[in-house]
């Protein structure tokens, strides 16, 4: 694709431990299109989080990589914080417990945008308001342990976009939250991606969650890319039995008709 933000070609990752090597990703060919919302779907151990970490340059030291990731939109490997933001699954461990919320967000803006501390702190307050945190001026001076799980994840999102990146990677950002807060966080991410013109890579095990907002879906299983395509096509006409089973597992009495029913 000529408008690819990132292009993976024959990309593989294995983890070395105790003299053995276990494959996490195997020969992945995948383009991430600039401006799209791409959902990476898979069960635990599918390699989806390894993909997110690889794109962010955050693989651990015992990772053995082959193949290639190219960045046509940048011409160079993107700079963490500046060119891409990363939202982790566990907001609690992502935040520094001894720094205030405002300090943590302002630090990103100060470092990457060259703002003075006063200006950066003002941007932190604006971002807290932007991610729909009530009383942002009070939360600015709060510490992570004083916030709810949903509020902490909003703070992490604010920090991830503080330097105005064009690429946002969200690795299972809702899995530790209740259903209502999950929907709120997804809605917030949708809004931010649209308003700021970002590309979103959203990693999740929940294909039903992704079905509501993704432009494209890529399904992973056992380190392999099972199928990828426009969300409507994957959801209504899955090519692989595994994808069909993921869809079927979410169709029950408590789930609105997802997918194939919508095409009927």
Q: Regions from the language model: what does each represent?
A:
Residues 210-212:
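A short, surface-exposed alpha-helical micro-motif characterized by mixed small hydrophobic
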Residues 225-229:
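ABC ATPase "signature
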Residues 119-138, 248:
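Conserved ABC ATPase "signature" region
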Residues 134, 235-264:
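C-terminal boundary and immediately downstream tail of ABC-type ATPase nucleotide-binding domains
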Residues 162-166:
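A short, proline-enriched helix->beta-strand linker immediately N-terminal to the Walker B motif
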Residues 142-147, 151:
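Conserved ABC ATPase signature
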Residues 60-61, 72-85, 103, 111, ...:
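ABC ATPase NBD coupling module
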């Amino acid at each position: 694709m000529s408008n690819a933000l990132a292009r993976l070609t024959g990309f593989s990752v294995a983890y070395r431990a105790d003299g053995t090597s276990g494959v996490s990703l195997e020969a992945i060919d995948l383009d991430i299109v600039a401006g799209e919302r791409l959902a990476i779907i898979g069960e635990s151990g599918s390699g989806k989080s390894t993909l997110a970490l690889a794109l962010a340059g955050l693989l651990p030291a015992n990772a053995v990589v082959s193949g290639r990731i190219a960045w046509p939109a940048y011409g160079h490997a993107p700079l963490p914080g500046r060119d891409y933001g990363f939202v982790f699954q566990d907001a609690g461990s992502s935040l520094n417990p001894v720094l205030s919320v405002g300090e943590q967000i302002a630090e990103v803006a100060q470092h990457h945008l060259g703002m003075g501390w006063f200006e950066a702190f003002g941007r932190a307050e604006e971002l807290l308001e932007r991610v729909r945190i009530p009383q942002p001026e009070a939360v600015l001076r709060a510490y992570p342990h004083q916030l709810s799980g949903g509020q902490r994840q909003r703070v992490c999102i604010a920090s991830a976009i503080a330097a105005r990146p064009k690429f946002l990677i969200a690795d299972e950002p809702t899995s530790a939250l209740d259903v209502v807060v999950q929907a709120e966080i997804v809605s917030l991410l949708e809004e931010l991606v649209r308003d700021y013109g970002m590309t979103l890579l959203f990693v999740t095990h929940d294909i039903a969650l992704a079905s509501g907002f993704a432009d494209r879906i890529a399904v992973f299983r056992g380190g392999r890319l099972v199928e990828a395509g426009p969300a409507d096509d994957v959801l209504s006409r899955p090519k692989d039995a595994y994808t069909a089973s993921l869809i079927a597992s979410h169709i029950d009495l408590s789930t609105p008709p997802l997918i194939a029913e919508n095409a009927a």
